[in-house]
Amino acid sequence: MTEPNLDEDGSKSSFQKTVVLRDWWLIKCPKEFEGKQFGVAGFEESVETRAMRVFTSSPITKALDVFTLLASDGIYITLRGFLNKERVLKNGFNPEISREFIFGFPPCWERVCNSCFEGDSFGTDVNTVPSTIEKACPPILSPCKYSNRNLKDNPAESREKSNVTETDIAEINDKGGSGARDIKTARRRSLHLQIKRILESSKVRKTANDGDHGSEFLNTAKRGDVERDGCEVINNEDSEWKLDESEVQNLCNDGDNGSEGFIKAKSSDVEKDKSEAIDNDVISPAVGSGIKHTGADNVDKVTSASATGESLTSEQQNGLLVTTASPHSLLKDLAKSSKPEKKGISKKSGKILRSDDNVVDPMNYSGTKVKSAENKRKIDASKLQSPTSNVAEHSKEGLNNAKSNDVEKDVCVAINNEVISPVKGFGKRLSGTDVERLTSKNATKESLTSVQRKGRVKVSKAFQDPLSKGKSKKSEKTLQSNSNVVEPMNHFRSEAEEAEENLSWEKIKRKIDFDVEVTPEKKVKQQKTNAASTDSLGQKRSRSGRVLVSSLEFWRNQIPVYDMDRNLIQVKDGSETNSAPSKGKGSDSRKRRNLKIK
């Protein structure tokens, strides 16, 4: 190591040779110096007056700190930046060296360089770098290379082994040249790979044991290719345990078994299309009747034809009524009727919704006994055609519902066994025997005249409980305590016309003159002028008889006023004319323009 030559007396100063590298990498020098063979190369820190140069050092003899090195020729090297990994691999070093030489030299840099150097010290081609990496770090393959996990398409013979063989260890030993150190590193790698392979196989066996519950399918799979290839193949199929819909329907149609048929139907997912059954009791579909029918013979299982997505058959043409309600409409009806102590009729499905979230079909309002299970989902059309006798016999149970296409729009209100017709009633009360049966012709808008349409009283589709008193938010009628219906104001068109005639439209109307500006006129304030006449001021006159103006007071903004003959009439104070403060620079000019326009 050469030191800078200094004079004996030290009268002259000198610079130490220093190189700053901003991008650096390790090299092996062609000539050793005192057993040192590793050096540093890199791009020199750029200077404005000088081009960028590549520096190659002699063997490093000492690392003063992490960033400062001393070469054998006495040059000090300062490192700035990180290690260039690509060039380090190109010079024959192992990729593991980048863990230690990240941004400088560690304290044990000589030992790390000797253990991580593999050969080709004077640089190799860049294309040989991937092969060097593969030899240094062999890849670890997963036990199952294919993503689809198919045992037939993925034979075990076509896979690569993940362990290191003895030939690989021999190659590493031949290339290393360091003897015992290379053998130790190769053994560590092979041991590490074997441990990983054992852990992966144990995980596969554990998953197979967890999924094995005594079934023969998994046992045969374990004997086969699952244990050999290490892939987990478990196929779970649940389609074999589905019940046939025909069997479920037969359970529902079995009316002789009574409540057992309902329990079986309930267990086989037919909860959507069944009526309420509690202790072999079926609630009557009539509104407000509250009568229960017992016995298996009287059980009527009400199902919906449209709930299963099927269209109505020819039963509708024969006069048979079948409930037409989709599952979505039933759910909406249940949500609307969730309030306590209220009942309502759905607009879409026509079902009566109770407070306990049960759906009851309002097909037979006469309150007759429910037929046997053989005649379920059907109502005789002859009973619907004679509602008067049925209402007379069972007037306490409810109303007769003549269900048609448009009856929902004009629903009758039943209060204390009396019916009020929304079309022809107008407050007229009819007894139970004289109930007027509404048909689709009377209910539709086509048969109604224009006067009846305009004068008809609107009735809400959502009913309120007849026992509840007070006003309904949706209804336009008021239910009082004596069950009388109070009609709202202005039912007829004639009353509205009279109200329009009585209004004084002349007071509301105003004439519009398009020639006048829309802006509101400001009231002109009658200002008190302090103008003084010439006589009162006692102005002097000239020889020609003209009045001479005395000196004006500028701070008061006095303005002389002349007539057409240029005679002085008076002197005004400008402060009163300009009493309002100016709103801008152009305020005076705007006033002058307005005066000219007028």
Swiss-Prot record:
Residues 19-111 form the SANTA domain. Expressed in shoot apical meristem, leaf primordia, basal parts of emerging leaves, inflorescence meristems, young inflorescences, developing flower buds, developing sepals and pistils, styles and young siliques. InterPro entries: Centromere_KNL-2_homolog, SANTA. Keywords: Cell cycle, Cell division, Centromere, Chromosome, DNA-binding, Meiosis, Mitosis, Nucleus, RNA-binding. Residues 335-403, 445-500, 520-542, 572-598 are annotated as: Disordered. The gene is KNL2. Residues 335-344, 371-381 have a biased composition (Basic and acidic residues). Disruption phenotype: Reduced growth, abnormal leaf shape, defect in mature pollen grain formation and aborted seeds, due to defects in mitosis and meiosis. It comes from Arabidopsis thaliana (Mouse-ear cress). One of its GO terms (cellular component) is chromocenter. One of its GO terms (biological process) is cell division. Residues 383-392, 527-539 have a biased composition (Polar residues). Coiled coil: none annotated. Residues 538-572 are annotated as: Required for localization at centromeres. This is Kinetochore-associated protein KNL-2 homolog. The keyword ATP-binding does not apply. One of its GO terms (molecular function) is RNA binding. Involved in recognition of centromeres and centromeric localization of the centromere-specific histone CENH3. Required for normal progression of mitosis and meiosis. May play a role in the determination of the epigenetic status of centromeres. Binds DNA and RNA in vitro. Belongs to the KNL2 family.
